[in-house]
Regions:
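Polytopic alpha-helical membrane-helix bundles and their juxtamembrane interface segments
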Residues: 1-24, 69-73, 80-189
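Generic detector of intrinsically disordered, low-complexity, polar/charged segments
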Residues: 29-32, 62, 85, 171
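Alpha-helical interaction segments
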Residues: 29, 48, 128-131
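Short, hydrophobic transmembrane alpha-helix segments
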Residues: 19-27, 41-48
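Hydrophobic alpha-helical membrane segments of integral membrane proteins
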Residues: 30-34, 52-56, 139-143, 161-163
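Short glycine/serine/threonine-biased micro-segments
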Residues: 30, 45, 154
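Alpha-helical membrane segments and adjacent membrane-interface helices in multi-pass membrane proteins
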Residues: 33-42, 46-70
Length: 189
C-alpha cells in the first residue's frame, strides 16, 4: 500500500478510536485494533521501530480492553490512581526508555531512538491506565502527543502529526469528560 494511503487509513481508524475513548465508548477498542495494525505497517516503513512495537502492543491491549469493557455492565466507573503509583510508573518508564533507546541506537538504523522509546514507554502506561479507566490516562496522553507531534513532522508524516495535534486536544476533552463521570459517580448520580 502506498505510504500516503496507508497514512490516511491508519489515521482515519485511529482518530475515530481515540475520539471514542474520550467518550468512554467500547467501540474504541476494535477500531483501535485496525488503526494500530495500519500504523505498525506505516511506522515500519519510516524506521520508527519502537512505534511499530508500540502499535503491536496496542493491538493486544485493545483486545484486552475490549474484553474488559465488554464484560462490565452498567455505568463504567472512572477512578484515580494513587500518586505514589504514578511516580513509580513514570520512573520505570524513564529507565526503560533509556535502556530501549540505547538498544535501538546501538543495534538498528532507528530514527530518534530515545524519543521514539519515550513515546513507547509512556504510551504503555497511558494505555494500561485507559484500560482500567483511570483519570490520569489523559495526562499521560497529553505528554505522549506533545512529544510525538514533532517526531512525526520530522519524518514527513504531516497528516499523522496533524492528527496527533487533534489527539492532544482530544486528551483535554477526555480529561474533562472523565472528570465529569468521576464526579457524577461520587455524587451517586
Amino acid at each position: 500500500m502506498e505510504l500516503m494511503y496507508l497514512e490516511y487509513a491508519a489515521n482515519g481508524f485511529y482518530l475515530l478510536a481515540v475520539f471514542l475513548a474520550a467518550r468512554n465508548s467500547i467501540h474504541t477498542w476494535w477500531l483501535g485494533i485496525i488503526g494500530c495494525l495500519l500504523f505498525a505497517a506505516l511506522f515500519y516503513q519510516v524506521k520508527l521501530y519502537a512505534e511499530v512495537l508500540l502499535m503491536l502492543f496496542f493491538v493486544v491491549t485493545n483486545g484486552i480492553g475490549w474484553y474488559q469493557w465488554g464484560r462490565q455492565s452498567g455505568v463504567k466507573q472512572v477512578t484515580n490512581t494513587p500518586l505514589w503509583r504514578l511516580a513509580g510508573y513514570s520512573a520505570l518508564a524513564a529507565l526503560v526508555t533509556l535502556l530501549y533507546g540505547y538498544i535501538l541506537h546501538s543495534m538498528t538504523d532507528a530514527y530518534a531512538p530515545f524519543i521514539d522509546s519515550a513515546i513507547l514507554m509512556f504510551s504503555v502506561i497511558a494505555q494500561f491506565l485507559l484500560m482500567n479507566r483511570k483519570l490520569e490516562t489523559w495526562w499521560f496522553w497529553l505528554v505522549v502527543n506533545t512529544v510525538a507531534v514533532p517526531l512525526y513532522f520530522s519524518r514527513e508524516l504531516q497528516l499523522t502529526a496533524i492528527v496527533y495535534i487533534g489527539f492532544w486536544f482530544n486528551a483535554w476533552y477526555g480529561l474533562y469528560l472523565w472528570r465529569a463521570l468521576r464526579s457524577a459517580a461520587a455524587r451517586g448520580a
